[in-house]
Design a protein with these regions (language model features):
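Histone-fold recognition with a strong bias for associated Lys/Arg-rich disordered tails
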Residues: 1-153
């Protein structure tokens, strides 16, 4: 197994745990981004941290996006005291946003040339969805962040 394969496996397992912990039915790009940010000592983690996007900051941005989306639907986030009850036996499978990111990554380079930064680049490349909305609400310059990732590729 290559170094990238080990990295991807670790990220996907961490993303699965994130999805399970928040009661999600599927592993989405947001879970993978949180997992990438939590991989201490990796280049993607350093790029995100340099942009002020550690795991806690990303989680806060994703929570703001969720509240904003509920508000757009006319629902106040605090109106209900509903919390997900994680099922330790539930094994979420990759959802649409994660599959799209993985497809973007796989389509951009040969497998043997992939690095952890390619995964981050693919996660940040989404034009629509939870991740770009969360980053926009957090005031992140997504174009500058993507450019910084591309510099490292």
């Amino acid at each position: 197994m290559s170094a990238f394969d080990r990295y991807l496996h670790t990220v996907l397992l961490a993303a699965q745990a994130e999805a399970r912990d928040d009661g999600s039915a599927a592993i989405e790009a947001r879970h993978a981004l949180l997992a990438v940010a939590a991989q201490d000592g990796t280049e993607p983690q350093r790029v995100l941290a340099a942009a002020g996007l550690g795991p806690a900051e990303l989680k806060a941005a994703l929570d703001r996006e969720f509240a904003h989306s509920l508000g757009a639907a006319g629902v106040a986030p605090g109106a209900f005291d509903l919390h997900a009850t994680p099922d330790p036996d539930h094994r979420p499978r990759p959802g649409a946003s994660l599959r799209l990111a993985l497809d973007r990554m796989a389509g951009s380079h040969r497998k043997k040339d992939l690095t952890p930064l390619h995964l981050l680049h693919a996660l940040l490349a989404a034009e629509v969805g939870t991740v770009p909305r969360a980053l926009d609400l957090a005031g992140v310059d997504r174009a500058a962040l993507a450019a910084r990732v591309r510099e490292g590729l």
